[in-house]
Amino acid sequence: DRNLNQMRSVAVYYKEYSSIENLQLLGENYIKQMKRDLTPLTFQTSILCQRIGIAKDGFYSSMREGHKYNASDFEFLDEKFKSGEWSAESGEAFTCDADSDVNKDAPICIGMDYNANINWIVAGQPDGRRLNVIKSFYVKFERKIPEVVADFCTYYASHRNKTVVYYYDATALGSNYAVNEQDFRWVVVHEFERHGWTVEAVYLGNPMRHDEKYLLINQGFAGKQRLMPFFNRQNNDDLILAIQAAGVSRGRNGFRKDKGGEKLAESEED
């Protein structure tokens, strides 16, 4: 018993629980709100406590932990908290001033994904042979392209070079299911300009075939392309989850990224 008690004195009990098991304290409305606000994968990990690792046979199988990095400007954060400008109770959102990987004198490159239920902006800057994915944004349901652009502009309000290099392909032309009248490209450019940003629009043509995209991306992760992608861990947790969980499906035209999970209907009432 003495030996057992000695081991117990330095032991730590660790167990992971789903938030559903704490439903009585959290309340049903909290769970519903989290399901509405978070991406499906983030809801699975942060609320349901399900572990999602990098799929070894997935679409982005060459991604490794080394492709993630931390870039918090702790000197800036310490100064803000010590001065009382920021506090845990203030609820004030962080901005790009808290990021140490942003070159404020260089343009920000962006790519976007347009969907009826969720719209994304992924922002990056090249740094030598690195492509640093510095931040990603998403909006869901009634919040569409104007809102995700506004979120971007708010976060990067102190960025000195207010230029975005907007890469888009044919999917941004002639489609408007995420907006009212104009196509995606027009709305993106219009919204950035309305917020005082300059847009350098770069048309990429038709979308790449999935097998070509797979080869390009995984060669990039392996350092065999001009740029190797790296992800700011704190600013891309939802994006990293999506990348790690992306699978591969095979059909008559070869393999492709499995978008089965992306196609599942998700309503505001779910």
Where are these regions (language model features)?
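Short boundary motifs at domain starts and secondary-structure transition points
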Residues: L4-Q6, T95-V102, Y155-S158
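Hydrophobic/aromatic beta-strand patches that form the interior of the parallel beta-sheet core
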Residues: Y13-E16, I110, Y167
